[in-house]
């Protein structure tokens, strides 16, 4: 897939917004605006992530990709978990033990690191759901029916895992949307066009706090 400058711009804007909402003074001064930004920022990140993940890789390449996610994830979650024992952190550990730290790493996660955990879980399921294809003959033999079957398997595994504390159903849904866009061979710039009036829809979204729930696909 060719580099998409539109996606680069969107990700840059989202990163700036992420930095902004984590400034304590901004959140205290504009709590409603912060909640509005959060309502679309992470769902957009998840859709883009699902769209950009490349599963046309060998097993070794995919392992390297997952390792690059898992290693910093384990380090950061471990450090944050230990810190949460000594400081008032939401959903922190109550006992400094391997079992509680292991629970944070492998099941519930902690702090902002849930996003990396979601990337690892969804990326792994995505890859293995489509792993039946022969990458060397990808464009010759893999039919639309095969793609639909793989998407069904992927959706089913996401649904099952989302019944556990390890994966949020809404996060899985947004990731899946990105995957569907990618597998449909639809170009991002053709699906999401530049329209000036979109800024008015964005302002309206910020005004409608009843749409802040991720479960509302109006996001």
Where do the model's predicted regions map?
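Alpha-helical transmembrane segments and their immediate juxtamembrane cytosolic regions
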Residues: 1-219
